[in-house]
Amino acid sequence: AEYEIDGGMVNLRADKLVGTQIFFDKNTVGATINAIMASVKADGLTIIENAAKEPHVVDLANCLNSMGADILGAGTDVIKIRGVKYLHGTTYSVIPDQIEAGTFMAIAAAARSNILIRNVIPKHLEPITQKLVKIGVQVEQFDDAVRVIGGPEYFGTSIKTNPHPGFPTDMQPQMAAVLTCAKGASMVTESIFDNRFRYVDELRRMGANISVEGRVAVIEGVERLKGAPVKATDLRAGAALIVAALGAEGVTEIYDIHHVERGYENMEVKLRSLGADIQKVDEPDPTAEEKLLRKAL
């Protein structure tokens, strides 16, 4: 394929694609998924080495195979794809979103509540479950559900994000929000993404005691967070602020929630069904003073 980068956009052109050997220097979900989709109708054999092993990578391969693709090894370090000429329609049930489930697990912990989360695959949640149990949260596992029961107090721990089956980077901000009120110190190490601590300044507005040095955040637990106006800087940062707000004292206003809506369907509706006092409001056009305040956020 030929490609060019123009104004932040990547333009690709090819009369046809040909199978090849791909080695990823860094384990990456997005690149693995794109390589799989590009290879299913390419001529010949494509071998992807150091492939991501996340459950949704396996699920994509299973879905494509049900459409006539020839994919072997999804969920291992090496995926082999022999291109086919045609794909056909299928009926397929997508696996539950383990990050959405994990976020509600974090909410139960932060709010010291009791939540039963249905339609999940508990095995996919094990890294999250283990950390929650370690800090003092009670988690009960069923065939396709988990019950999370928050405790009266939590204790600090260390978390390091890693590719699957390690602790997922997409749960790092939400777990950090829980740890802001855990006794003692916690250390959160982000080994996958840069700039994954952009939510820290917003949690500080709520009273969190967090210091960041490079890829490591040190959290000194406080008794309780306090509501404040904060801004969602990205999808998981916004989720972390919701986690924090539901355990905080007073009212929290979260701006730029379009980031959250990109990855969570009807979140405020689900939270209200659990008894949360939360509502989505349309913002009027800001005054000049409000614009300055927003800029300061």
Located regions from the model:
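Structural preference for solvent-exposed beta-strand-turn elements
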Residues: A1-L297
